Curated annotation (Swiss-Prot):
Protein name as catalogued: Glomulin
Native species: Mus musculus
Quaternary structure and interacting proteins, as annotated: Interacts with FKBP4 and FKBP1A. Interacts with RBX1 (via RING domain). Identified in complexes that contain RBX1 plus one of the cullins CUL1, CUL2, CUL3, and CUL4A. Identified in a SCF complex composed of CUL1, RBX1, SKP1, FBXW7 and GLMN. Component of a SCF-like complex consisting of CUL7, RBX1, SKP1, FBXW8 and GLMN. Interacts with unphosphorylated MET and is released upon MET phosphorylation.
Comment, domains: The C-terminal half of the protein is important for interaction with RBX1.
Taxonomic superkingdom: Eukaryota
Entry function: Regulatory component of cullin-RING-based SCF (SKP1-Cullin-F-box protein) E3 ubiquitin-protein ligase complexes. Inhibits E3 ubiquitin ligase activity by binding to the RING domain of RBX1 and inhibiting its interaction with the E2 ubiquitin-conjugating enzyme CDC34. Inhibits RBX1-mediated neddylation of CUL1. Required for normal stability and normal cellular levels of key components of SCF ubiquitin ligase complexes, including FBXW7, RBX1, CUL1, CUL2, CUL3, CUL4A, and thereby contributes to the regulation of CCNE1 and MYC levels. Essential for normal development of the vasculature.
Length: 596
């Protein structure tokens, strides 16, 4: 029935000129052809399409059959039917109006979701390439439309991260990346072969957009296999190499992009790139920078005369982009790029003026976020080691400036303790090696004003700030032991009265208040233990106006005793510091009396 219906429509249209075909004819042709496929009359449909007398009809109306044929192929019919469907598809690509066929193919690419995205892309890429190459004009627009549609669909696929996931390629992204490169190659070659052609200049712009989109997705999040392994088996490395190769071929080599990024005058004239640079290009260029400096792809294109500090300056804004993201796969690349850039520098060689550049302060603050908020321990430790490496590379004034910045902005006791330990290390170097004005005298006293104080005086939450307080006390103990009152190299003894008023006395008061509070809570908890055990439930304890999360009574007691132990520890160090101050002051007084 469906075959007869289709033949009837064709017979009626054979006597008409192409421009006389009605909209109704198109609809009836599509409906009858679709029924032929659904009812299994694929061989008869193939014969109708192969008939030379139907060539004009197929040219005008045949593109309507592409959708049903493609869906038939994706359903996976028996082998002979599948082969006939492929023959029909090839004939439609060969005979149909390329403009209509292009739109039909792109609509089909936009339809699916999930794992079907890669299936249909892999099926349609080669026909899509053929159709575009047949277009008489506006090829640049068509290539851009196709690449944009393909990228939009591929960006929906999850990026595999582990070696096992890459090899399994469950969603087909790796296969699609490889196929997409093959799809793009002829158009790149077309740009190279005739650079003076105005249409090719537009085509170059579309290819440039595609390359930057590819650098953002999937390459921004993609993980790469170890370089010692067979690089040919790493689909993302191969994709990255091809993209960087395309950029060079169309006139935008790696040095031009990396060395000119961020300048007022761009290396390209395309308006969209000018307007969207900060939003769209930042992540793409960051991705490119990572590929070049960490993965070594295209690094041979860079001039060898660039200084390590200049390269660091180039990379810092890209590192900032990486660290602003919350995805582990992305900000871990920022850590790698930072490490690669810093290891090129000598210790203490990075001039303090670099901290006047926004990214040079934003990056260490980004590292603090990784150290304090990242759920993965290895990355937290990596962030800590990168912050230490960055500190090591700064000159003395740079270290001093960064310490002040971190103490004012980190709002994290552990980070502040880390900074205070670094301050102690710098003071120690000033004692043991060359006198350093930034960690002695007036400059150091200004820094100690930040360190040897309680954020909220006696009301400070000592438990929450225990890391910082212990580090501050240890620094003060070190200074008292190391610096004699007569020498007063650090300026400590001159400022001792202020330190006692701003730090030691409020700390005493805070400790007494905190210990009394926690001891009362322990007593209450112990009294309530019997009731809680009878109820076989959980109890709650309120500390500092905030309720400790529900937990068994035994666990709450452990938490309270642990807090009390922390206060005892702080108190013992505080007592030792005050004892040392008294001994040192008494010793100096006796010496002065002896001299008189």
């Amino acid at each position: 029935m469906a075959v007869e219906e289709l033949q009837s429509i064709i017979k009626r249209c054979q006597i008409l000129e192409e421009h006389d075909f009605k909209e109704e004819d198109f609809g009836l042709f599509q409906l009858a052809g679709q029924r032929c496929i659904e009812d299994g009359y694929i061989n008869q449909l193939l014969e109708i399409i192969q008939d030379e007398k139907n060539k004009t009809i197929i040219k005008s109306m045949g593109w309507n059959l592409v959708g049903p044929v493609v869906r038939c192929l994706l359903r996976g019919r028996e082998e002979d039917k599948r082969e006939e469907c492929f023959l029909i598809f090839d004939l439609l690509v060969k005979l149909c109006n390329p403009k209509e066929l292009l739109l039909g193919l792109l609509e089909l690419i936009e339809e699916p979701s999930g794992k079907q995205i890669s299936q249909i892309i892999l099926l349609l890429l080669q026909p899509l390439q053929t159709v575009i190459q047949k277009l008489p004009n506006n090829k640049a627009y068509s290539v851009g439309l196709a690449l944009s549609t393909l990228w939009s669909q591929l960006s929906l696929l999850p990026v595999p991260h582990s070696e096992e996931q890459i090899q399994a390629d469950d969603y087909g992204l790796c296969q699609c990346c490889k196929a997409l490169i093959e799809f793009t190659k002829p158009f790149v070659e077309e740009v190279i072969s005739d650079k003076e052609n105005k249409e090719n200049a537009k085509l170059k712009d579309e290819l440039l957009k595609f390359c930057f989109k590819g650098l953002k997705c999937p390459l921004l999040t993609a993980q790469f296999l170890e370089q010692s392994e067979d690089v040919g088996n790493d689909p993302f490395r191969c994709f990255a190499s091809e993209i960087i190769g395309f950029l060079s071929k169309i006139g935008h080599p790696v040095p031009q992009i990396i060395l000119n990024h961020g300048r007022k005058k761009r290396t390209w004239d395309y308006l969209e790139f000018e307007e969207e640079e900060d939003k769209q290009l930042a992540e793409s260029v960051a991705s490119l920078t990572y590929l070049v400096f960490v993965q070594g792809i295209g690094i041979d294109q860079l001039p060898m005369v660039l200084s390590p500090s200049y390269l660091l300056q180039l990379n810092m804004e890209h590192i900032e982009v990486f660290l602003q993201r919350t995805e582990q796969s992305i900000y871990s690349k920022g850590l790698e790029l930072l490490e690669t850039s810093l290891l090129r520098l000598e210790d203490n060689s990075l001039c303090y003026q670099y901290l006047e550049i926004k990214s040079f302060l934003a990056v260490p603050q980004g590292l603090v976020k990784v150290m304090t908020l990242c759920p993965i321990e290895t990355l937290r430790k990596k962030g800590l080691s990168m912050l230490q490496l960055f500190i090591d590379k700064l000159d003395s004034q740079g270290k001093y400036t960064l310490f002040r910045c971190l103490l004012n902005t980190s709002n994290h006791s552990g980070v502040e303790a880390f900074v205070i330990q670094n301050i102690k290390n710098q003071i120690d170097l000033s004692f043991k090696k060359t006198y350093n004005k930034w960690f002695a005298g007036a400059q150091l006293i200004s820094l100690l004003d930040l360190v040897l104080s309680l954020p909220e005086g006696a009301e400070t939450d000592l438990l929450q700030n225990s890391d910082r307080i212990m580090a501050s006390l240890n620094l003060l103990r070190y200074l008292v032991i190391k610096d004699n009152e007569d020498d007063n190299q650090t300026g400590l003894w001159t400022e001792l009265g202020k330190i006692e008023n701003n730090f030691l006395k409020p700390l005493h008061i805070g400790l007494n208040m905190s210990k009394a509070h926690y001891e009362a809570e322990i007593k209450n908890s112990q009294q309530n233990n019997q009731v809680a055990s009878m109820c076989k439930g959980v109890c709650s304890v309120t500390v500092g106006g905030e309720e400790i999360p529900s937990m068994p009574p035994e666990m709450q007691l452990k938490v309270l005793h642990s807090a009390l132990f922390t206060f005892d520890l702080i108190e013992s160090v505080l007592a030792r510091v005050e004892e040392l101050i008294e001994i040192k002051s008494k010793s100096t007084s006796e010496e002065n009396v002896g001299i008189k």
